């Protein structure tokens, strides 16, 4: 496990059975994620990892007049690789002291060692920085898989002609896409 107390993995805060969110009962109405010590709380709730691959790099959109994109709630990482490297070293989230400590944990798992050497070369563990970067690439590659972007919601099925919206859902869609500066779709983009 890649957390200090071996109590948490990426899937703890990004549960695949709950749309890759942190669905644990944490005593604060799920407003913040629990840390590795199962007592400390992070600054905020972990965002879903679903569809994160579609988030553009964090930037100011001059046409729209506001910032868009990035990873984490505040856009502080521009890539999935950058996002994957943050939580293991965050003192509350996973609490590991250093990249070396994370890499040493990876080396405890023979499957990881064999896989890393097969994919990244037999010398991947000779340099902790390179091995850590390889880990972030592996996690990001998984986050880019179809597992994280299933496109199987009612709305997705509606777009494919496989589902008819109820009158209430149709009204909600009209409000969501209303053509004004305060529409839901201004921030929650559903079409490229």
Question: Model-derived features: where do they sit?
Answer:
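Periplasmic c-type cytochrome electron-transfer domains
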Residues: 1-192
